[in-house]
């Protein structure tokens, strides 16, 4: 039964043709260099998320899958928790409350409305609650509302308060029994220990010490002889001798044990666990039972019970029922430990099963499992329900039995709060990475060892971060972050799936008597260790026999060797089986160093969507599937004919007579400020099939992932301007918007009720000219289409200001003219520093329109500003091989090097970036890019027939027109000799010239002089990505701005509109040059001399000389700190007189500030803010 859960077998017919883009109707024809046939299509890339959530809510689709797998009575996650909880009994046992049948109503609002109105995409959860009065037998049943339950969208995400979030799967150590060995430093003896780790409850640890006695630790308390525990469980000395008589160390432990009988042993354990409490036999017996043998306190979980049974060879043929420890488990664990210490290879357990005796590797994927989204939410609900259980028990005792109904007992607040807390604040519920479709897809397939119950990055060692042989086909060895999280966060491999126990499985083709079949078995890492596995590219004949006598295989632990074909059990299904989706999109990955491939996989996720997407000339065949499963393209649900197409929607009349309308997302803002826009790629009257892509999204072209642009690249130095990874670009890319992207920023402001009155959104703003208000409508909100720059008003808002004390002059003026100035201040929403763009959208939410707003908020306005960013110096570009760089110079087209036919190159990369980084894949991509762009024709009609280098190529690769798109799958792509042959077979241009030689180099001419460069240069097409590290977001300048309240020094950082810190080392430089006055200015009037700052400004305005600096505020802070340490510090002048330190209430300062119109009020965010 258990083996059945772990092994899922599916078959495919042997005649299945190679999976290419053609398996998706209407897909572009990408010519593949793959030599191997894949017998299995890539599974749904979001299944790890969607199937787990389906299990949680008990969806019909999940039940059908579970039944097909052989589960007789599948139980959903919510149902499981409610069954665990039920019944809740009161303290006397006279009444009980049980829950069953969780079900959902319709979701409250569609996904788009939830995003728009900051709502949570959720459905109301109802359960049937049954109250039973055990004294009278009376039963009251009610349907109870358990709160709004966040639902998963079709794309595997959650919408929480209007933002899209992803719950990341967590890699944790599986519950079970783990044997370990260590070397004692003093005696150099090999010592063994074992931990029994439950899903929930106390740990039980046994170990053999250097004195050769077997000890036990219960719940991490003091060690005691293991025989004490056996006696406490009711064993006599004779029984212990009978079972463990073979072992000297057990016998010596029994001799040293002073307890005589069960009662004494129980009391001994009680004293260790509860020191200071008076021990009694009953309390000791209850304590031991509660610790390990009661389901309320101890839970091995199904997976823990399965692992214990498997390791110790217990009840392997029976279904899993108990989730607590049993006496048999404890005894078998002790025997296994003893036999391990004595060096025995196997152990025969009662029932005649023989199990191998060996230590465990805790980093092995047989011992690490995934907590997927369903289980993580289930655990949180369990926490909420246990809090609710306490409330129910209290209410049972306080309320009148006759009046009790399930509704009066239940308080759903703890459950709702637990779910909200998880989605809002958990480390595993993350703001979705929406930079581009690939980043979102990868985020949903991420595996994290961090989070509650997991590791912490500070304590994680090298072993747990390292690549392990059991990761093969389960977790990608390439894709992981650089930095402190390296190895702790990974990505699921392409073909991997998660089984019901949470272990990751990978598929293999069954090999029977040396014949490879198309039967697919999914194996866990444990299962795989028992078998001999051949690699996917082992040569086969048409019948599936291995063509070579000796086959390269791997055995347990990743050991590689040659064996005869009859010894092989399984074979990989695909060469890309071991890598993740992002890594599988790197062509020629096999020629890249792993460190650079890691950067390449990570940087594809940082690519920004461009105005015009362009699919790569050189792909891997993964682009189409990744784009469709990412969910940003629109896919036809049914076959039919397109009736109507517009920029906003597509209407399809299906063959069954139903009409389907697909709406496009138009210029929406993603979580990362990039532009998500969909556009149709079908025409009215066109026939579409089910599953066909009908509209492209961001970063897609014709349904394929298109993260960058195919650019003509020359790899050469150029006047030193591309030194150290700098990049030289052609101005054509700027003028023709080749690398232009659109970025959308959201600006929000609300009008609240304040103590002094309500704030108001209005056009009537004090002290603002009509010129500034020109783009505001009558409500005070900027019009759509307005061009705005930093400092421009987007939404006018005024806030009531407290009445100030009037001067006698003002009172006189008011008495004469009877004019009362409006006591409001301008708190309008303005465009932040360094930002500009065009207003493309406005959303107004108001209480009057019955919109849901937070307490105290009357109106909320959102303004969307779009910015078109052309490529510029300082932007970061990258290829797919970790070859990244910053643009150092943009040259006019006429100055760029050009080919013999006059074509200027688009981009110049330095040659030094290749050899030491060992990412040769970029060079091969460049060559194949040129071949694909030019087209080719292999001369097979000549006297020699098919050339040697082309013998392994399929016939469809013998010729191709120009602008073909090709696929070179990872580990199964174009070979070097094929590339050389193809370069020699490229089609000539319109003048009949072939410009690139067989070695991939061309003669280039200097655009400035027209002279040829002395050596041939590698030229071809490389796929270049524009990354999210844009110079516009980083460049920053300040003249005057906000100051820190305490030190009065300028703030730091672009976000605070801060200044550039002139630090300690910079001061040393000034001192070294003797620049005393410059240094004095920097430390005083340019920084935190509050009086001096204003006086200097006054002097500059009036054209006077700069006055002497005063005392910096930070010096006053230093004095205050010393005084707070009870040190009396006085400042003396040169003649010994004490100088009084005043806190900035200088009359000169106030007068000068008033004359200059500067507000020095401490209530303002800055003491000197608007000097204009």
Curated annotation (Swiss-Prot):
One of its GO terms (molecular function) is ribonucleoside binding. GO terms for biological process: DNA-templated transcription. Keywords: DNA-directed RNA polymerase, Nucleotidyltransferase, Transcription, Transferase. It catalyses: RNA(n) + a ribonucleoside 5'-triphosphate = RNA(n+1) + diphosphate. It comes from the Bacteria. Pfam families: RNA_pol_Rpb2_1, RNA_pol_Rpb2_2, RNA_pol_Rpb2_3, RNA_pol_Rpb2_45, RNA_pol_Rpb2_6, RNA_pol_Rpb2_7. The keyword Nucleotidyltransferase applies. Its EC number is 2.7.7.6. GO terms for cellular component: DNA-directed RNA polymerase complex. HAMAP family: RNApol_bact_RpoB. The RNAP catalytic core consists of 2 alpha, 1 beta, 1 beta' and 1 omega subunit. When a sigma factor is associated with the core the holoenzyme is formed, which can initiate transcription. PANTHER family: DNA-DIRECTED RNA POLYMERASE I SUBUNIT 2 (PTHR20856). This is DNA-directed RNA polymerase subunit beta. The gene is rpoB.
